């Protein structure tokens, strides 16, 4: 985790400690996670990946390893990494149990200083990870390791809904001090070195279904309530794209 930048080094150490605790079983998940609300966003991302046979895939922030497992099942030769040694260990354990470890490598390293060769990946994937990073350094590294024409898919929380920001301020125990959800208006400058990017937003009116998970029995009704709201959201966002700034999540597709 060594870095020549002492501020970045301190940040990396804080992130590693937080996520080591999280993946060691500490109660660091909000209540609404029991309803798995981000599964809908992940499904959209996974479906966009298509067949990964013959492709080298880089996974950012492997966490518990379930995305790593899916990438391997889709045929990818996966290189996964995390800042947390505990996350890397959990991922290796899951892959070994499912007979997929030979298709994957799992390492501990910072996204701001990757140990991979230039232009060595066809695809990069990350879920709720890049908002934890020094974006300028991490995106420069992403550009370096992607092949020409390579694609990065990242699902990330957004920063500009005031109700979500209020909730975040009220629940600091569930997040790190350094994380910074994304702002859509900043994407063009952040991604200027890439050939193109596109994004789709999720959870506008469907945030009401997430809020319901805090009511008694709310997690049980979440699937039935969220499905029509997702359809409404997509119609609203097609009609008025600028409403995306008020959404909870964005799904980025970045092409080198």
What name fits each language-model region?
Residues 201-256:
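A C-terminal cap/extension of S-adenosyl-L-methionine-dependent methyltransferases
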Residues 136-151:
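A short glycine-rich, Lys/Arg-flanked "PGG" loop and its adjoining helix->strand segment in the class I
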Residues 1-53, 153-175:
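Conserved class I S-adenosyl-L-methionine
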Residues 58, 64-113:
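Class I SAM-dependent methyltransferase SAM/SAH-binding core
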């Amino acid at each position: 985790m060594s870095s020549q930048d002492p501020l970045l080094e301190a940040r990396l150490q804080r992130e590693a400690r937080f996520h080591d605790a999280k993946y060691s079983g500490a109660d660091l998940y909000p209540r609404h996670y029991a309803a798995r609300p981000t599964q809908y966003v992940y499904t959209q991302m996974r479906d966009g990946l298509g067949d990964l046979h013959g492709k080298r895939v880089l996974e950012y922030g492997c966490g518990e390893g379930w995305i790593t497992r899916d990438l391997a099942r889709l045929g990818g030769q996966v290189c996964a990494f995390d800042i947390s040694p505990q996350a890397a260990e959990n991922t290796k354990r899951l892959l070994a149990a499912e007979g997929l470890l030979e298709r994957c490598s799992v390492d501990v390293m910072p996204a701001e200083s990757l140990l991979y060769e230039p232009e060595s990946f066809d695809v990069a994937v990350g879920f709720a990870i890049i908002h934890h990073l020094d974006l300028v350094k991490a995106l420069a590294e992403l550009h370096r390791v992607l092949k020409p024409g390579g694609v990065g898919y990242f699902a990330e929380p957004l920063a500009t809904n005031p109700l979500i920001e209020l909730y975040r301020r009220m629940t600091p125990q569930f997040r790190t001090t350094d994380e910074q959800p994304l702002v859509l208006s900043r994407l063009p400058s952040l991604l200027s070195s890439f050939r193109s990017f596109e994004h789709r937003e999720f959870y506008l009116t469907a945030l009401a279904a997430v809020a319901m998970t805090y009511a008694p029995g709310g997690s049980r009704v979440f699937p039935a309530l969220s499905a029509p709201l997702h359809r409404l959201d997509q119609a609203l966002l097609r009609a008025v794209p600028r409403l995306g700034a008020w959404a909870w999540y964005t799904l980025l597709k970045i092409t080198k």
